[in-house]
Regions:
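Transmembrane alpha-helical insertion/packing segments
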Residues: 1-50
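Interfacial segments of alpha-helical transmembrane regions
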Residues: 4-17, 60-79
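Hydrophobic cores of alpha-helical transmembrane segments in multi-pass inner/ER membrane proteins
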Residues: 16, 49-60, 132-146
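Hydrophobic alpha-helical membrane-insertion segments
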Residues: 19, 70-96
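Physicochemical signature of membrane-embedded alpha-helices that form the seven-helix bundle of GPCRs
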Residues: 45-49, 71-74, 78-81, 125-136
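Hydrophobic alpha-helical transmembrane segments
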Residues: 53-54, 111-140
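Juxtamembrane non-transmembrane "cap" segments at the membrane-aqueous interface
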Residues: 88-113
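Cytosolic juxtamembrane helix at the C-terminal end of the final transmembrane segment
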Residues: 93-97, 139-159
Length: 159
């Protein structure tokens, strides 16, 4: 292990672990009004959609797998982009070809959770529960991409 790449990988592993831990607690521990699990329905598919690739990314970081870290970094970026698509596009732009119907927001009970952003008509408002997840996810994505870049730059420098 090269000492100069370990801090980047360790930071990414910690960020991913914190994000996954928060995601699991948030999906399965009722903390109303932070989350509203009563209206959300089963959360295991959602949890596993984050945990499986997240744990594989942590494993790749621990094993120093350049390709695994790169794929994991790609997943973290897609993970953040999907959250932006789900919450921020409807909030900022209203109905778009991607979001014509906002019943998921009202039926999922998200309108009853804590928010700090002002409402914008009948548009979904990103609640604190999801803003926290998005900040953790963005941090994990940035640190995992940084770890991937460091792994590849070290490999090309050694070649």
């Amino acid at each position: 292990m090269r000492p100069d790449e370990w801090p980047a990988r360790r930071a990414a592993m910690v960020a991913l672990g914190l994000m996954l831990g928060y995601f699991a607690v948030d999906n399965h521990v009722p903390l109303y009004p932070w989350n509203n699990l009563a209206a959300a329905g089963p959360q295991w598919p959602s949890t596993l959609s984050g945990w499986v690739p997240g744990l594989l990314t942590i494993w790749a970081l621990a094993r120093r797998s350049r390709w695994g870290i790169t794929v994991g970094a790609g997943w973290t970026v897609v993970w953040v982009l999907l959250q932006l698509r789900q919450w921020w596009l409807p909030y900022l732009l209203g109905p778009t070809p991607l979001h014509r119907d906002f019943t998921w927001y009202w039926e999922g009970g998200y309108s009853e959770t804590l928010r700090i952003l002002p409402g914008r008509g009948a548009r979904p408002v990103p609640d604190l529960e999801h803003v926290a997840l998005q900040l953790l996810s963005l941090t994990a994505a940035l640190l995992t991409v940084r770890a991937a870049v460091r792994m590849w730059s070290r490999a090309t420098a050694a070649a």
